[in-house]
Amino acid sequence: MGDKANAHPGAAGRATAADHPASVRNVVLVGHSGSGKTTLVEALALTAGAVNRAGRVEDGGTVSDYDEIEHRQQRSVQLSLVPVEWDGIKVNLLDTPGYADFVGELRAGLRAADAALFVVSASDGVDGSTRMVWEECAAVGMPRAIVITHLESARADFEGMTRTCAEAFGGDDPDAVIPLYLPLHGPQGPDGHAPVTGLVGLLSRKLFDYASGERKESEPGEDQLPEMEEARNRLIEGIISESEDETLMDRYLGGEQIDFGTLVEDLERAVARGVFFPVLAAAPAAEGARQGIGTVELLELVTGGFPTPFEHPTPGVTTINGKPREIKPCDTEGPLVAEVVKTASDPYVGRVSMVRVFSGTLRPDETVHVSGHGLADRGHEDHDVDERVGALSTPFGKQQRVVTHAIAGDLVCVAKLGRAETGDTLSAKDDPLLMEPWEMPDPLLPLAIEAHSKADEDKLSQGLSRLVAEDPTMRLEQNPNTHQVVLWCLGEAHADVALERLRSRYGVQVDVVPHKVSLRETFAAKSGGRGRHVKQSGGHGQYAICEIEVEPLPGGSGIEFVDKVVGGAVPRQFIPSVEKGVRAQAAKGVAAGYPLIDVRVTLLDGKAHSVDSSDAAFQTAGALALREAASDVKIHLLEPVAEVTILVGDDYVGAIMSDLSGRRGRVLGTEQTTGSRTLVRAEVPEIEIGRYAVDLRSLSHGTARFNRAYARHEPMPPQIAERIREEVRAAS
């Protein structure tokens, strides 16, 4: 680990394909936007020798932020893979966006990784969304470590931030969150700020000074020993308390000096088991320096303490018919099981799929089975196809290095899988398998869009289909009631990136229009109507008269048609014609142009002509009768109501309840959950929650999540209904 007093192992440059799973580490970087994840990846790449000079986010020169959108916004918006090699180990660094709108990219990174580095700014602290991701990792036992960045800030407080991390991440055992190093400070400047120039190794009792631009090891001074020993004892006690050797604590308390090698081995095992969470510090390299502060120590932790892919259980696997299939973890000779964790479009090579291989070995030019199931509700139809694998490559940001194979445990990019989408399983053609999907948040911000011009109409459908194939946190809806094309996103930033990609990648200009909800109409009371369609001015005429009664029904009843004609007043062959006309008019609406629902229409009487009556005439009469019945009674305008479930921190429950009240919501109940959070259930009109995905984030400072489901339609308040009717009249 970084505390081992060994010589610098040197850097082997950019990593290529791994030859054995034991020589791979898959690590995802997690943290809020601006915490320094991308800068840290750049510093690690420099220390490992993968780059000769570290780029800056502000200049658009980093390896992992290579998209033009990322350059303009100066933040990550997608998952990026940067493999480096350290001490003979290939380290796949997965840089993820920190902004909540791009949580789908984060979840893909978590799926592909075997361990996580939580990056925390020394000056900004831990936000609510980072805490929630930590809890998700804890639930599945993913090993984690914490890296404190922005040590150069005048507001940086390493000791205070370590305590904050212990409180935020330690749960019932805050002593499991302990630093392996303390910052080493240089001389104070004129402003009184003493810059961090290196680290104090607690286990090794060594100083690691980076002031020269490269790590140099030395002994601590007498004045540094008291603070070091106090922190060292806390660290040793923390390691021993998590040791699998139950005699170690007794020996330590009995005065035995536990040797350095035993402590390091126990530390590494505890980290790999996901029960001990070391805190490290890191800072980017200064101009001209070869190594950033703490980067050597961090690479040693990753290669020595983080688990190999052998220790990562394979997610559940079934046959495509749903029969469970036992797959040995990371068996390079086993059946092929791989998963597409990211899909991107390259202007030169077409679709590129980033794949994590869980079992077997993937090779170019092989035919594989591509299977995607379980996302039909998001516009991803179930699909099973055979496809030929194109070239395999190891990515380094936007660059690609061709490789000959990818073994179980490794990550690789596959070219030209035309049907594969994010989340799909790749398996052998003659042994098709399916991995259980990972959990993705529902996109809850609707974006109604239209092609800007005729020339854009054909390209829009193709562009949207590709976007949704790449990003399973987007959902495409063609609403048959409002006749709108709606792209559901996770938030405004997510929507902005989607629009920009439509324009820049697919050459589609779109207009964003107000999103409409699916309103309905119904009768407030019983009413009758007579439809008379008579035209007899010579030649073959039209003759149809019908009388109906309309009465309201309970919600969810739809349109019920009843025939009570006696004596053949309406010939039997024309009764279906009346019903067809009634249903056609109901679909168009009878007041404000919204479909009519939840009524019973009873045909009572009518008249026909032996020559001039026809199917078309009675359809028209049926429609006229329904319109007349509507003119004599109050028509309710119905709005859809959603059942909303909100998980929010206890501190924000009051604000959430007050906001729901302002949205005409009805709180159904609350329920206390774990982690000082409350589950709030409410019913809210859909017209009031169009932007709730954005507003809730603001109300809860990013700590709340919600889901919504259609409950029913119910009458709108009269003043709101009248406003909508006026808008309809003004538009007609």
PLM region spans:
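Structural and coupling elements of P-loop NTPases
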Residues: 1-732
